[in-house]
Amino acid sequence: MFTRRLGPDPHANGASTPSLRGCPDILEMETGDFAVIGKDITGEAANRLIAGASCGPDERIVWIPRKTLVLAKSDIPEGA
């Protein structure tokens, strides 16, 4: 299902988080799509989305720290 992590391991170099099961992460899937592990903020953010954005009943708005995405940038493939 998942082929690799984009960006560094959130626990690398002894980084501490509340638990090994509670870290933001970006994973590439076998299909080439991506999965994001983060905090579900759908309840508080769904009514505050920018114009043209929407969240369907089977979707969630997920928050990840800026640092997580910035550090993954070099691992994100170019093109479609």
Regions found by a protein language model. Name each.
Residues A53-A80:
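C-terminal structural segments of small proteins and small subunits
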Residues S16-E59:
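A short, structured beta-strand/loop element
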Residues M1-C23:
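Short, charged/polar N-terminal "headpieces" of proteins
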Residues R4-G7, L27, I37, W63:
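Residues in well-ordered beta-strands of folded domains
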Residues G7-P10, E30, G38-D40, T68:
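Generic secondary-structure microfeatures
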